[in-house]
Amino acid sequence: MKKLLLLLLAAILALGCAACAAKPYAPAGEGTGNVELDEQVLALLQELCDPKADLVTNLGAVYDFLCTGITYRATLADTSGGFTDELTNSLALELLQKRRGNCDAQAALTAVLLRRMGCEARIVQGTFLRADDPTPVEHAWVYAVVNGTGCWFDPLYGGHFAENPRDYFMADDARMALTHQWDAAAD
C-alpha cells in the first residue's frame, strides 16, 4: 500500500512539474515565409531568448550571438538591386547554416531576427571607417524600431572593430555617425 501511494504521489508530482515547465520563447513577429529559414530562426531564438525577459534583454542576447557566434568572411553579394526579400532570406539562411559570412549576410540575418522578434527592421547600405585607415569601406547594417524608438544594430562592426561591441547595439544616430556614413535621405 505504501509503494502504491508513493508511486501515485510521484506520478502526480511528475504531471505537476510538466505543467509548470518553462514555456519556450514565442517571438512576436511573423516569419519570412521561407519554411527552412523560419524553422532555423525560431530554433535560434528559442535557444538565445528568455521567455520571461523583456524585448531589449532578448535583443541583447541575439546581438551578442551575432557578434561572437558568426565568423566574418570577405565575400561579395550582388546587392545592386537592393535587399529584396528573396536576397535577404537567402543570405540569412546561408549565414545560419555556415555561421560565417560578410556584412550583407550579417545585416540580412540581423534584420530577419529582429523582424521575427516583432521589430521593424531594414538593411542600410553605406560605408564605415576603421581607426587605422581613413579609406571608407562599403558596408551594410540594420536600422530598427524598438519599442517605438529608431536605433541601429551593427554586430559585425561592433564585434570586430569597436572597443566595446555594445556601442553598436541599439545605437543612436550620433554614435553611428562617428564611424558610419549613409544616405540619410533614404531614412
Please report, for each region that a protein language model flagged, where it lies by residue.
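Sec-dependent signal peptide cleavage junction
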Residues: 15-31
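Active-site nucleophilic cysteine motif
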Residues: 58-62, 99-114
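A glycine-rich, coil/turn loop motif that links secondary-structure elements
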Residues: 9, 81-82, 100, 129-133
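Secondary-structure boundary elements
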Residues: 31-97
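Short, low-complexity, Pro/Ser/Thr/Gly-rich segments in the mature regions of secreted, periplasmic
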Residues: 176-187
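Hydrophobic/aromatic-rich core segments of domains that either
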Residues: 105-174
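Bacterial N-terminal signal peptides
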Residues: 8-16
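Positively charged n-region of N-terminal signal peptides that target proteins for export
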Residues: 1-4
